[in-house]
Structure formats: structure tokens, C-alpha cells
Amino acid sequence: MKKYCPNIAGIVLGLLFIMSAVMVLFHLVKMPPPPEGSNMAMFFAAFGPTGYMTFVKIFELTGGILVTIPRLRNLGLLLLGPVIVNIIAFHLFVAANPKGLIDPILSPIIMLALYLLWVGRKNFAGLLN
């Protein structure tokens, strides 16, 4: 069982990011607009036209695919790490809603990523030396 948990966690985390990226890149879901004049509206107004959101979603797609493949999981975590940190920062500072961190989608993403980092901590130890 211990052998399969990281694989299951990697597949679930990868699929969450793959689905998120595909939905945005191929315009499968229309996102409701944020309230006018809010920090979120200004944030997304800057991200949309510049193409930065597309860049982030391509990273999410690539990282999600890599996390689902056990041999490439750590590379995928290296790509997804900054994305996850930015999602957390968005909820804390832009949306100004710390309760957003217990979102039913965001909480499992954070927990799965932390679990996979813990499982692969020996592989990441070389980066700290």
C-alpha cells in the first residue's frame, strides 16, 4: 500500500492541474467576471491581454503531465511548486481571503503536493547542499 500511495497522489495532483489548464487553454469553461474595481478584476485585467495566464497554464499542463509519471514526478513538482505558491499568494493578498485556502480544490492540491514533496524529500535534499 505504501508503494502505491505516491503514485495515486501523483495521478490525482497531475489530473487536477491538467484539467485546470485544459479548461482555460481551450476555453471550455466561462469564468464569471470578478467584481468591478476589485483587486481581482485589476489582477486578471493585467494577466489576460499580456498572455501571462496562458504561460502559467502551459506550465500547469506540463507540470501536471510530469507529476503523473513516477520517474518524472520530481521535475513536475519543481514546475508546479511556484504555481502553487502563487495560487496561495493570490488567495492571501489579491483576493484578501485567507478562507480561500480551505477551498475544496485548493486544499487537496496543497496537501497532495506537500505529501509528494515529503515522499521525495531525499531526492530534493541534493538541491539544498
Predicted regions and their residues:
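Extended, low-polarity transmembrane helix blocks
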Residues: M1-L28, I69-N129
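Solvent-exposed, well-ordered loop and adjacent helix/strand elements within mature globular domains
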Residues: M19-F55
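Core segments of transmembrane alpha-helices
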Residues: K57-T62
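C-terminal ends of transmembrane helices
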Residues: I65-L66
